[in-house]
Amino acid sequence: MFLLVCSGDVYSQHKTLRTINLVGYVVDSFLDVGITNAKVTLMAQDSTVVDSVNVRKRSPNGMVTYTEYSFNVPAQKSTYIIKAEAPNYKTGYLAYSIKHVGRNVRIEMPTLKLKKSRRYGLDEENVLDEVVVKATKIKMYYRGDTLVYNADAFSLPDGSMLDGLIKQMPGATLNENGEIHINGRKIDYLSLNGKKMFDGNNQLVISNLPYYTVKNLKVFEKNKDEDEALGKESRVKDYVMDVSLKKEYSKNNFMNAKAGIGTKDRMLARAFDSFFSDTWGGIAYVNVNNLNQTRLPGWDGSFSEAASPKSNVENKQFGLSGQYERNQGNVKEEFSLSGDIKDTETEKKQLQELFMPDGNVFKNTDERQDTRISKFKFSNDLQIKKPYLLKSRTQIEYQDGKDNSTSSNETLKEILANHTRKAERRKDRDLSLSQEIVWSALTPWGDRYGFQAKANYECGRVRSGEHQNIAYPRADADSIYEFVANENVKRRAYDYSLYGLYQYELLGGKRILVGYQYEQADEKRDRARLRNNLDDNSFHANTFGRFHMPSIGFDWQKGKWYAFAQLLINLQTDEMKYCKNSLDTLFSRSYTDLRPSLLVFRKSNDSYLELKSNYGSVTKPRVTDIVDARDDSDPLLITLGNTGLKKSSAWHTDVKYSYHNRSNRFSLDVTSNVNLHFNNIVHSYMYNEMDGSYTIRPENVNGYWAAALWLKTENIIGKARRWSFRNDVNYDYSHKIGISGTSSTAMSRNVINSHIVADKAKLSFQYKRMYIAALGGIKYQGSRCDSNVNMNYNAYDIHYGINMNCRLPLDIQIACDMTMYQRKGYDFESINDDNLIGNVSLSRSFIKGRLLVSLTTYDIFHQLSSIERTISDQSNTETTYNSIPRYGMISLTYKFGKH
């Protein structure tokens, strides 16, 4: 079949005259930027003129960085002379010979660098061709295939950060993890003035960059680094958002500092600094606060109960990131250093209902926990490209944690089974190191080949101690069991992988990709649990694995359509050793996984359709899961192994469709997915009715599946485009399987069917600097059990309210939001109530806009609460957390640098 395909392409080659696209660039030899008014002439070896063109601007990172020309010439060996000329520059020449034709369809030539004529000075205006555009109130428009959001057209409260702007942009969604979706598609990474900062961590950039510095945000598709380096056009491109700063901040150092003090011991101190030039840029920030959040009133009214700040959190954050590039971006280095120290005080009440065949078991818990987690991360990326690609990535991560907690809980079915009081302390440290090297190049005949080497090392240690008191109620007298235990767990692991790829270019837009990867991993775990001496729950475990992963893929592109199919075979062998007390066992397991995947999409100017489907292994059992051993270190939670446990696998399918009218009047986004799980690993629960303890054991079950559908519409209303209406509807369904039983009944399967239906709507109006929005939504959660377990839940969450910001007399800005939250159908009666959440902020600027004074009040009615509800295959859990207290704060913000 392979020979047949190749021969068919050869025949096609002779049947029609082939051409090759010659691509080159013209830049200023000193500034290394594009010359926008250059003219390029293609001549034969005897200086006969073949063709001539004017250069066009290329914006691979959303900014004008260089200018490009291209010619289509016959696909044959020949020599050409390229002449480039521009006003105020010396004419430049380049001789280029096509030595290898093969299956090449595009050849990138050396860059032509023109020198200034001596009679002229450096006229930066001719080089940069900067265009000054007067401010417009149009929020968004298309420039070719690039979607541009005009930041000045939006109305935000003073002191807002970039994330506030993104939440107001039409077609944009921003979740709590910092993931950005534009018109239904996820942004792969965010750049700042064309430079990627903080290793692509969107959250760090958007929550620290002041909104007032932003000129516009550009959303576009960009060639991947590998393809750009080799002069290829990517078939699956990165979806990028580039934040363009205003002129006064783009080539200058600027700094923003904010400090605030409030009631209830609230405080805030924050500083942001940045510098950008044509070749390098950097940003730095410091943020210290005990506010749990960065949100300002009047943003978008998304201060929902599920996302409300739970616990009391004090954050200390810092970061430094920079990028340097030269030679038209062919040499680029990026680095980032960040730190995050978080102190959390948590108080929670939890009601858990475990599903049992002869009556459910209830567990009530009260817990107080003080936690400190410190995270530090450093990364460095070096990239060299043209005529090949070489990438090196180094990353170091360190985490240190401390935890002190006290809790009390009681377990009961029809009568109280036990009452427990527990005090626990814990310290942990983790260090991870990783190094990756990627090299890719083209053969003279147009095929691509590449290699990748990657190595990781991790080590960690957990030390903990606990004091537990368990009371078992009896008719005559309570039985008290009390113990003190200390535990020390060490973990060391490494892995490395070697990967090779060859991409065979066929004619007609087809390619064959063949790859092979070898990986080796080793993990050691030592657990020493001490009461008075080393007890039976101490162990040593070691897992050594080898992976061989050959793969073959085929992709095809024609017009607006693209398809890619791949089959990867994972041949894995694990050698496991487990030592515990008198048990010393050594065994091995082998797995063969077939992992097919399919990607199909169609793109046009106003729509995008995508189908993605893949099958593969999800979870492989750990050595502690498959060894025949018992762990009763917690007398109320006993763990058993299962020697017959198998790996689990799943089939995932996603379908996306987006339609967006280029007039920006209407947009539609539809997303659906289906997940089918096979041999899903769950933990069976056996409840001991005598003492209230549980014995859990990993098991394989079939029948678990889930599906979801999400529909979003957005419409801009009126000729003046002042009104907009957005509606989001989503439906989630899950069919979960669990196993449970008691000491007096046999183990049985529980089939849990859960439905979540939600609808959120927002109507907004903006006129000049006044913005007002009305919003509302309802969410239904329903769960039922098809077996003999008693379970039938129906809960509702309803919210509605308004938010606004506008200018008052004396140049005072007010921003506020008011939202009513209602909950119905929860098991905790105290949860079923109404909460009115209100926030107000007043601000005014002084010293020509350099100084901003703000007065802010949060939760003015003191009704904020934090609730979570989860339903698994074994239980229904409702948890209430302490929330940050209501407070008022006065803050000062000062802008340094040119303004």
Predicted regions span which residues?
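Outer membrane beta-barrel strand-and-loop segments of large Gram-negative receptors
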Residues: 364, 537-539, 640-642, 646, ...
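C-terminal beta-barrel architecture of Gram-negative outer-membrane proteins
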Residues: 729, 772-845
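Short Pro-Gly-centered beta-turn/loop motif in secreted/extracellular proteins
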Residues: 63-79
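Signature of Gram-negative outer-membrane beta-barrel scaffolds
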Residues: 485, 495-497, 509-605, 609-612
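Outer-membrane beta-barrel translocator domains and adjoining extracellular loop/strand segments
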Residues: 230-231, 286, 295-301, 345-361, ...
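A short, amphipathic beta-strand motif
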Residues: 20-29
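Membrane-proximal, glycine/serine-rich, low-complexity loop/turn segments characteristic
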Residues: 12-19, 32, 41-43, 47, ...
